[in-house]
Design a protein with these regions (language model features):
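N-terminal alpha-helical segment of soluble enzymes
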Residues: 42-50
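Conserved PLP-enzyme active-site core in the AAT-like
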Residues: 2-26, 30, 54-72, 76-267, ...
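Amphipathic/hydrophobic helical signal segments and adjacent flexible N-terminal regions
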Residues: 354-356, 364-398, 406, 487-497
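Generic N-terminal amphipathic, Lys/Arg-enriched alpha-helix
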Residues: 15-25, 34-43, 305-310
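Conserved C-terminal alpha-helix-loop-beta "cap" of PLP-dependent enzymes
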Residues: 7, 286-379
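Flexible, glycine/charged-enriched surface loops at secondary-structure junctions
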Residues: 49-54, 68-69, 242-246, 265-275, ...
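Central antiparallel beta-sheet cores of small beta-barrel/beta-sandwich binding domains
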Residues: 391-497
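Active-site pocket-lining segment
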Residues: 248-314
Length: 497
């Protein structure tokens, strides 16, 4: 390994220009200089971690206007230790028994359905029973002496006070003495007051390595001191189910330094700078006939960034937004951005396709590189997308499927019920669920898609391979869960006489 700017390339890993946002999978953010310097200085000495946590907690309270603060192991780690605090109350005899909550007075967490998400594994890991509710009335009816906590994600509407808002939930919960944890992981930080604490939340959790640009492995908890002292007790270096959520002295100091820096950053000027990046890109690519651009300014706190949408007719350019995003992310210099026209990937309109550029994690000079790359990519001559070849086989029927995961073999089943020329429909039975299966056959090349969907979880299956008579084989892409291999054998039904 080489140290310095080429550290990643020396390992055979090509860095990316981040035009997508604070996604952990691409590194989320870069440290503010103050955090970088603070972490370097922190690593030079030893310190007693409980004493450090008290000093950091007090200073975070001074900076934020909250009663107390804790640096956690990421936002998810913060959610976990806050849940542990809610069920233990700071009682170490309870702490060391988690996740076995037998004998605990409180073992339930209420979550509004719209707040159920993959990150609530951090809460489920504690062993609590999750109570999912759809309305404010259901939430209030679900509150009982066994309710340890309510977890929620805030509304994206500024100032929302309607049903299931932070304000409405906190008001109802306060009457029953139930703490409310707000997950504000990707939000811009608000201080003196924090908007969610001002709305009545007990604790608010942030990711340290997103908008705040602190250590990527750190999180930030602000709120009620008693609950947060129990949360700190639940985390490393203290033993128990939170021992794996370690926060080192460097992360503690780096996170505090990032919050200190946040109070001094010129946020309005930063947004003007980010908009300037997008204007540079927009001016360059809009010179191409048939390409349109629009810049959207942020209105809320979540993922607060100006965004540029670049749209075109896929029939004229022979490329979809996903084609363009894939090309830009897999060729040098690599650029990570989003496909689709609107927020969260929504298409711009029926006849347009697009890519979106988020500006807030771009670095000086990135705008010119990105402008040239997108201009050149859109200017390339591409052959028209060819018509699909005639299918080489009739795939209707049942298929026994063997999937080879990294360290396990699993048996699944395809039931292909319809084959309309190149288009296929049916079902995919996995080890745990049965799901819709859709796909295509192009000559002997097959692509199937299904998803094992559960409340707050989704395991995607994209099968791609080839068919040869009554057998199929190829690879499976599972999104964030990486890849596996599959083989399938058609079940030949005996002919009736």
């Amino acid at each position: 390994m080489k140290f310095g700017p080429e550290v990643y390339r020396s390992l055979g890993v090509e860095p990316v220009i981040n035009c997508r946002g604070t996604f952990t999978i691409i590194g989320a953010s870069t440290l503010v200089p103050e955090a970088k310097e603070a972490m370097y200085n922190a690593q030079s000495n030893y310190v007693q971690l409980d004493e450090l946590a008290m000093g950091v907690g007090k200073r975070l309270a001074e900076l934020s206007g909250a009663e107390w603060g804790v640096v956690s192991c990421g936002c998810a780690g913060g959610m976990k230790i806050t849940t542990m605090a809610a069920v233990t109350g700071g009682n170490p005899e309870k702490l060391v028994r988690i996740p076995d909550l037998t004998g605990f007075e409180k073992d339930e967490v209420i979550i509004p359905r719209r707040s159920r998400n993959t990150y609530d594994h951090a809460i489920r890991n504690v062993g609590v029973k999750i109570i999912t509710v759809d309305t404010q009335e259901e939430l209030e009816a679900a509150m009982n002496p066994r309710t340890a906590m309510i977890y929620m994600m805030p509304s994206t509407k500024p100032g929302d006070t309607g049903p299931l808002s932070v304000h409405a939930i906190s008001k109802a919960a306060k009457l029953k003495g139930i703490p409310v944890l707000v997950d504000a992981a990707a939000e811009a930080l608000t201080l003196n007051p924090n908007v969610h604490l001002a709305d009545g939340a007990t604790v608010v959790a942030y990711s340290g390595g997103k908008a705040i640009r602190g250590p990527q492995s750190a999180g930030l908890l602000l709120g009620d001191k008693k609950l947060l002292m129990a949360a700190w007790q639940s985390s490393a270096p203290h033993h128990g189910a939170g021992r794996d959520n370690k926060v080192g002295k460097e992360e503690q100091i780096g996170m505090l330094a990032a919050v200190e820096a946040w109070t001094k950053r010129n946020h309005a000027q930063e947004e003007l700078t980010w908009t300037g990046y997008l204007e540079t890109i927009s001016k360059r690519v809009s010179a191409i006939s048939g390409v349109t651009t629009s810049i959207r300014q942020p209105t809320g706190l979540d993922n607060r960034t100006p965004t540029l949408t670049i749209s075109w007719d896929p029939a004229k350019f022979n490329a979809s937004g996903q084609d363009m995003a894939t090309y830009l992310s897999t060729t040098k210099p690599r650029i990570a951005l989003s496909a689709g026209g609107g927020r969260r990937g929504a298409p711009a309109s029926e006849n347009l396709t697009s890519i979106s550029v988020a500006a807030f994690m771009m670095q000086p000079g990135d705008d010119k590189i990105v402008a040239d790359r997108i201009f050149n990519a859109l200017s390339m001559k591409r052959p028209a997308i060819p018509e699909m070849k005639a299918p080489s086989a009739d795939l209707k029927g049942r298929w026994d499927v063997t999937i080879e995961y990294f360290n396990e073999v699993s048996k699944h089943t395809f039931s292909i019920e319809q084959q309309d020329s190149n288009w296929l429909k049916g079902s995919h039975k996995s080890a745990f669920t049965t799901n819709e299966l859709e796909g295509t056959i192009d000559g002997n090349a097959v692509i199937f898609r299904s998803a094992s969907r559960m409340l707050a979880d989704n395991v995607p299956f994209t099968f791609s391979g080839t068919v040869n008579g009554d057998t199929m084989s190829g690879n499976i892409h599972h999104g964030e869960y990486l890849t596996s291999k599959f083989t399938a054998k058609k079940v030949i039904q005996p002919s009736s006489r």
